[in-house]
């Protein structure tokens, strides 16, 4: 028995455990059901979270993918089995619950095991699928280049600004746009976790835009695998999901040639993913605009010092040697700061020690000759991509700009007139319409970085390398572009072998030609443009030379010393459209022009002709005549001008000839009534003899004009920004004329040395008629009877404030010169000016002026942007009511104060003008406070004497530190008292 005891004990133990387990399972039936339901829900969710992105990722790892597929299959089976058992337990009786409970526990164990394996899969896939935040992009850095560093800083500022969701980086080919954004990308990588983006994606787009290829680059950074058979739409959805998971992303699209629809690529809109940004680089500003960028950063060429350093880096130490350095610097400068050109030329000259070789290269570059093949391949071919992108019309317009010398600022109107003469501008009805179309083309070429702003207003120029490229196109072409360009090269003579029958354009302008050769008649049979202007030594143009160009459309002899022009009947220039003889100051007479049947433009500005050109009245297509600055023009025969039926522009600005009304003029001379007969006239600039014209309100033909400049009285010109329709009255008693009818059409009025202004103003006020078109008013050399003003002020101000007439409701500019006002308020109150639109005030040599606004005047001038005051000895302040609670000029951008010895203050202590950008204070020694604080973030330049700057007192001590970098000291010279200028002119 004793030996059986252990066996019996074990049997009883097993029976107890089995029974206990059954009882326990029966008791825990409900809890087991609940636990299985919860685990089953987690497993189902886990299986669903094994996203398509994870599956496609694992195609790179076949064994791992097989394990995942097996897990998913097992999970599916267990989930199905568990759901089936859970359904069965509903109909399970109490007696069967222990068995059912045991089965549920078994399935629960399987579910938990699969759940554990699934979690391990997810963790492993999360590690595998997490892309590097920023990948290094190989390339040189620009961090040590001044200009590039500034542009990089602008982009970085944009990345931190909530207003800049999309940033455009644009510039000409080879200027370094890609290098700039590569540097940005790599700087972000160096910053690691401190940079703000969860993911930075650098994508190369290129000219041949392939949406699929761009999507593939983005998908690769997101570790999304792409399938050949997968549609762009489906891939876009997966990219969208991937990017939306990122906290913030930065997408850099490099080399964009056409606008891209980011939605079609799957890029979330920036408002959907706050803080995310898109940067794109393009050669074309228009692409940036089309893609609705919020900030556009133009990449400019390198500064000279940075360009030299880059050249040295590529050319080697030889360029620093004494015998090469000077000529090497000149070669570097010929590259115009364009990095691509600097690298190409520098590399080609690397290690070259022979000075003659360097001189040869410099000579070739200065003549726009590609002296090595790599210049064509590495510089011109990339630029040709931009050129090929242009429409044919724009290509011709671009090439024509290369006819001008290197670094030449081209007048936009001049080049557009060339385009019009060549037939590049469509016939849009009027010359002004065609001119506007041409200006639009100029702007588009600027947006393509093929033209840039010139040194003067309304001019453009070509970058040296771009011009070399254009000349390369023209010289190597044998089609309609084939041209000879030798402008600005110091040429002293032109040989016949330089010319060829295939040439379409010939530019010999700005040289030292003294004579021109006789050529074979009709030798250059295709040449339509011949530019000879700027040859100051040229005294004669032989008939034999011009006869070689029978198809000329444009002939420019401006700035030469020719005394006469060959007989037009002998020249047979039957296709000539435009003849430019501007500033031929020796030219006193022209032959009859009646045989130039297609002539539309004649420019005689600055010539010494004595009489009106003959034969123009026979030309049915003639549209533009420039007789400005013809200081010796004395005669215009009657009934000639009225026959110029197609004339659209008559410019006689500063001409000696003065027009008179019928009955006043000398017998046989033209009268102003003839001008009224010109139904197509749109632009007119003339000088009228005296006031009778102003008395004739029947001259309503004035309202047909789109532009006019009428000078009544003595010759007087003062340019403003609103000269579109300008009336100048000089040395007349204006109380004897009625100008109200003319002011209705006028945008700018100038009164110089006029009497009776008080009476004229009184009449205008009493007529209760404002002039809404007038935007600029100039009053100069006028003594005003202030007693009369008081009377007129009381007349106007006696009305209810709402009834007070604002005589000039849209006035934007006001110029006062040598006017004896004590305050600007006198003029403002007298005319009832509310000054709501005034942008510019310019006051000079008003010796009695003590303040702008007096104590009675508490108004602000809300839109005033510029104040310029000089030589006003009595001026003490700008506003007498210095305790006014807000700046009276809240939007002032430019403040220029010169030679104001008694000026003490311009603002309250501590007052800040937040919009100030430019300040100039010269010889204002008592002024010791500026309305500037450390919050003035728009300041660009402050100009003044160093001694004055050091005496300034600052309410905000940190303001000095903030604006000190923008201070430009001027040379201190004694105050000049302009006695001569105080005399009435």
Curated annotation (Swiss-Prot):
UniProt-annotated binding residues for ATP: 171-178
One function term, GO molecular function aspect: ATP binding
GO terms (BP aspect): defense response
Keyword Repeat: yes
LRR repeats: 502-523, 526-547, 551-572, 575-597, 598-620, 621-643
Coiled coil: 24-88
Keywords tagged on the record: ATP-binding, Coiled coil, Leucine-rich repeat, Nucleotide-binding, Plant defense, Repeat
Domain NB-ARC: from-to ranges: 167-429
Repeat in keyword set: yes
PANTHER family: NB-ARC DOMAIN-CONTAINING PROTEIN, NB-ARC DOMAIN-CONTAINING PROTEIN-RELATED
Family: Belongs to the disease resistance NB-LRR family.
Domain notes for this protein: The LRR repeats probably act as specificity determinant of pathogen recognition.
Role description: Disease resistance protein.
Protein name, per record: Disease resistance protein At4g27190
Protein source organism: Arabidopsis thaliana
Organism ancestry: Eukaryota, Viridiplantae, Streptophyta, Embryophyta, Tracheophyta
């Amino acid at each position: 028995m004793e030996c059986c005891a252990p066996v019996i004990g074990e049997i009883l133990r097993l029976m107890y455990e089995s029974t206990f387990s059954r009882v326990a399972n029966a008791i825990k039936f409900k809890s087991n059901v609940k636990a299985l339901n919860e685990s089953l829900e987690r497993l189902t969710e886990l299986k669903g979270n094994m996203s398509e992105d994870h599956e496609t990722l694992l195609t790179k790892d076949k064994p791992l993918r097989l394990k995942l597929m097996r897990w998913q299959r097992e999970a599916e089976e267990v989930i199905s089995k568990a759901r089936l058992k859970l359904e069965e337990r509903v109909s399970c009786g109490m007696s069967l619950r222990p068995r059912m409970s045991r089965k549920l526990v078994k399935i629960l164990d399987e579910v938990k095991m699969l759940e554990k394996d699934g979690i391990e899969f997810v963790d492993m896939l999360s590690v595998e699928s997490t892309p590097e935040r920023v990948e290094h992009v190989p390339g040189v850095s620009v961090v040590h280049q001044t200009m590039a560093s500034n542009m990089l800083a602008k982009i970085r500022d944009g990345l931190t600004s909530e207003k800049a969701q999309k940033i455009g980086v644009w510039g000409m080919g080879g200027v370094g746009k890609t290098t700039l954004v590569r540097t940005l990308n790599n700087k972000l990588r160096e910053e690691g976790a401190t940079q703000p983006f969860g993911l930075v994606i650098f994508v190369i787009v290129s000219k041949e835009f392939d949406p699929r290829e761009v999507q593939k680059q983005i998908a690769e950074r997101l570790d999304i695998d792409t399938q050949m058979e997968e549609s762009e739409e489906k891939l876009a959805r997966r990219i969208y999901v991937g990017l939306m998971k990122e906290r913030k992303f930065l997408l850099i699209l490099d080399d964009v040639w056409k606008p891209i629809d980011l939605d079609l690529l799957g890029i979330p809109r920036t408002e959907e993913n706050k803080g995310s940004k898109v940067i794109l680089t393009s050669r074309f500003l228009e692409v940036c605009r089309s893609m609705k960028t919020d900030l556009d950063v133009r990449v400019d060429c390198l500064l000279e010092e940075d360009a030299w350093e880059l050249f040295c880096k590529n050319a080697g130490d030889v360029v620093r040697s004494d015998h090469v350095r000077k000529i090497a610097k000149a070669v570097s400068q010929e590259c115009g700061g364009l990095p691509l050109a600097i690298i190409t030329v520098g590399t080609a000259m690397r290690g070259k020690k022979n000075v003659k070789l360097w001189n040869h290269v410099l000579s070739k570059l200065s003549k726009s000759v590609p002296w090595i093949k790599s210049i064509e391949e590495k510089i011109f071919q990339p630029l040709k991509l931009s050129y090929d992108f242009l429409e044919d019309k724009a290509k011709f317009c671009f090439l024509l700009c290369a006819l001008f010398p290197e670094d030449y600022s081209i007048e936009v109107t001049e080049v557009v007139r060339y385009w019009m003469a060549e037939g590049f501008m469509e016939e849009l009805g009027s010359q002004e319409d065609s001119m506007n179309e041409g200006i639009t083309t100029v702007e588009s070429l600027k947006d393509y970085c093929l033209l840039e702003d010139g040194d003067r207003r309304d001019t453009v120029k070509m970058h040296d390398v771009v011009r070399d490229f254009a000349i390369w196109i023209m010289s190597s072409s044998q089609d309609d572009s084939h041209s000879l360009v030798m402008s600005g090269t110091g040429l002293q003579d032109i040989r016949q072998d330089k010319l060829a029958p295939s040439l379409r354009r010939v530019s010999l302008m700005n040289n030292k030609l003294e004579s021109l050769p006789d050529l074979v008649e009709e030798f250059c049979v295709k040449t339509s443009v011949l530019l000879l202007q700027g040859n100051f030594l040229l005294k004669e143009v032989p008939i034999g030379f011009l006869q070689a160009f029978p198809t000329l459309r444009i002939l420019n002899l401006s700035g030469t010393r020719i005394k006469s022009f060959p007989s037009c009947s002998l020249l047979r220039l039957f296709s000539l459209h435009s003849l430019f003889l501007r500033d031929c100051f020796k030219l006193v007479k022209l032959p009859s022009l009646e045989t130039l049947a297609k002539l539309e433009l004649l420019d005689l500005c600055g010539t010494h002709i004595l009489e009106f050109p003959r034969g123009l009245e026979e030309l049915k297509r003639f549209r533009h005549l420039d007789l400005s600055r013809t200081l010796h023009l004395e005669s215009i025969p009657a009934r000639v001008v009225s026959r110029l039926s197609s004339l659209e522009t008559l410019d006689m600005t500063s001409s000696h000839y003065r027009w008179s009304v019928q009955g006043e003029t000398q017998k046989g001379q033209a009268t102003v009534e003839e001008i009224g007969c010109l139904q197509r006239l749109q632009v007119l600039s003339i000088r009228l003899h005296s006031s009778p014209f102003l008395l004739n309100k029947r001259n309503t033909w004035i309202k047909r004009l789109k532009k006019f400049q009428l000078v009544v009285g003595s010759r007087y010109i003062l340019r403003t920004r609103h000269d579109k329709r300008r009336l100048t009255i000089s040395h007349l008693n204006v109380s004897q004329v009625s100008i109200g009818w003319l002011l209705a059409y006028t945008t700018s009025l100038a009164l110089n040395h006029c009497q009776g202004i008080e009476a004229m103003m009184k009449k205008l006020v009493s007529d209760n008629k404002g002039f809404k078109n007038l935007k600029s008013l100039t009053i100069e050399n006028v003594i005003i009877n202030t007693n009369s003003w008081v009377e007129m002020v009381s007349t106007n101000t006696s009305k209810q404030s709402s009834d007070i007439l604002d005589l000039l409701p849209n006035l934007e500019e006001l110029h006062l010169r040598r006017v004896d006002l004590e305050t600007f308020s006198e003029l403002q109150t007298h005319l009832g000016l509310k000054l709501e639109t005034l942008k510019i005030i310019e006051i000079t040599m008003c010796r009695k002026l003590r303040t702008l606004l007096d104590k009675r005047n508490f108004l602000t001038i809300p839109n005033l942007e510029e104040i310029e005051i000089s030589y006003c000895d009595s001026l003490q302040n700008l506003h007498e009511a210095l305790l006014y609670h807000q700046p009276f000029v809240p939007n002032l951008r430019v403040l220029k104060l010169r030679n104001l010895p008694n000026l003490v203050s311009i603002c309250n202590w501590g007052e800040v003008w937040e919009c100030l950008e430019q300040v100039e204070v010269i010889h204002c020694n008592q002024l010791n406070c500026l309305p500037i604080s450390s919050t003035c973030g728009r300041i660009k330049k402050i100009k003044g004497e160093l001694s004055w700057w050091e005496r300034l007192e600052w309410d905000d001590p940190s303001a000095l530190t903030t604006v000190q970098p923008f201070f430009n000291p001027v040379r201190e010279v004694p105050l000049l008292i302009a006695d001569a200028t105080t005399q009435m002119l």
